[in-house]
Amino acid sequence: MDEADSWELYLALGLPKDATSDQIKESYYRLSRLFHPDRHTADQKAAAEEKFQIIQHAYEVLSDPSKKEIYDNFGEQGLKTDWNVGFPGKSAEELKNKIREQIQERDIHEIDSLVQSRSETTIVVNMTPLFARNIRVQNALGLGAGTRMLTPYERFSLIQWVSFQIKSSFSIPTSFSNDLKKPSFNSFSSGSFDDEFSAPSDEDEGNHKTSSRLSIVTEASMRQNSKLQPSIFAVYHSQPSPNLSSEIGFSLLRPGLITVKSVYAINNQTFIVPLIQISGLKRPPQATVVIGRQITRFGTLTARWKTGVWSLGSWGIASPRGANSSFSLTWQQMKAIPNSLVPQLSWNAEVTAGLMYSGIAYNYNLKNATEDSPYQIKLGTSMSTVGGLQVSGDTSRKVGRYSTFGVNISVGVPTGSITFSLNWSRLGQKISLPIMWCSVFDRSAVFWGLVFPITSILGVEQFFLRPRRLSNQKRLRLLRLQKLKDSQERKKVSAIRAVKLMKEIVEKKQKLEMEKGGLVIEYAEYRVVNCGANEPDLKQDVTISIAALVENSRLAIPSSVSKSSIIGIYPLFSDNEKELEIVYTFHQQRHRVVLRDKQGVFLPSREHKILS
């Protein structure tokens, strides 16, 4: 729904969208007296009748709580819909709840069609043979082995896939709540559970969210020269209270696996996440505990402890030691983004100590995607007992309204090994193609794996994508300006007509105010700040429109709404700041005030008095 659709009726009464019922009633009574057809001459009666009907319709909708609720959410089109909520005996609050439920159901259906079904496909490819120089071959006479150069065709024929993994999931809502937060969606998998943890978020608080749901997660993975390993998980998510959410997952195929996880927010700064994984009765369960606390405004410290595979006496002593105990500390630093209420990641650092793996890692968010530059760039480095020193770079950009394409490059130091990954995602679907490029330093591999793709991306961005993006932005801006100009012309004609209708009645009211020494508007001008005398289109005389607001020697203009929403004032065609100047007399003393476009005021005020 266009936002303007749920705004026009408020503009008809000259009110902000958060106007109270008393303000709606007061504005209606004042405007109905101004534009009542019986108070105008015969040549103005038709125009007054049209304006009066608009005001009458606006008041009928906005003064009715149920109609107002529908209009605020669906606009005029919603008023034409039979909502089936007019049951006798229903209170205004019950009607609001009924409408809210219908709105929430509609939103859930829209979200379900977009993100409830998710899938992820990963295919690992080994392309290191592309840069193999020689190959060892057996002598045909059986006199030993020699080497020879590989042909390009032979190199390409040696490229092969290493492994693939396909994972998909979908959710079925089982119950809803208007008060609970939405539990974060983290699918269980048969692999690592490190990504199952996330801090509780308050951004969805107060919205209608699923308080419990059932998720089905299927996964199939296979390595070269090995059997396919399928798995199916059923995961039940519930949120019994705003501070607590829990999940329990069951493996429906052998080997049996049960996973239990909870997220508990102790307060607004501290959370704890315990996770237990049970894989049969022959070994003790594995556990992971995460404790996090917000230390600074944008900084959070997280501690994670994993038991790994362990034994208690003879219980579990025969189990393979695939994942041993570890402890890690992570600091996550966010940063504020202009014109955004949600902070974004700036950098994070992690230190891990364990029996099988120990290391440090640091990631820095170099650039966030913006409207002018849709690229997001991240840099990272890590050093561990398993992979040595690794340096990585990741860049991604939107290639459509819902699609994102990204490239990740990782370089091993000092071996010079290169691995890069191509990633594509659209809504809940994701495809990853990790490519093993070279295992040792090779100039050809570095050129084709680093220099060529980076320069190609920069060249395409600089000489093709960026000019095209700027051209589209310019074209869209011109279209918006033309649309605004057409709308401004229509509103200008309507405002001039309204001033003509009000002028005679307002002048009579001002004459009465003058006779009793009340509030008299001498002059009012709505203009662009610092506009020159040779720019008549950037200012307008609004004396009649402001004087029409005077009631019983008082004038009130609400805040947070543009002055162009006042009856008889049309928008000025400019992106610059606007202001309203009012010169008035009260008790035969002159006053003057200059207001910003969305600044409220109550007249008269001693602060506005002009000192002689």
Curated annotation (Swiss-Prot):
SMART domains: DnaJ. GO terms for biological process: cristae formation. It is a single-pass membrane protein. InterPro entries: DnaJ-like_C11_C (IPR024586), DnaJ_domain (IPR001623), DnaJ_domain_CS (IPR018253), DNAJC11-like_beta-barrel (IPR055225), J_dom_sf (IPR036869), Mito_inner_membrane_organizer (IPR052243). Residues 8-75 form the J domain. It is found in: Membrane. The keyword Membrane applies. GO terms for cellular component: MIB complex. This is Uncharacterized J domain-containing protein C63.03. It comes from Schizosaccharomyces pombe (strain 972 / ATCC 24843) (Fission yeast).
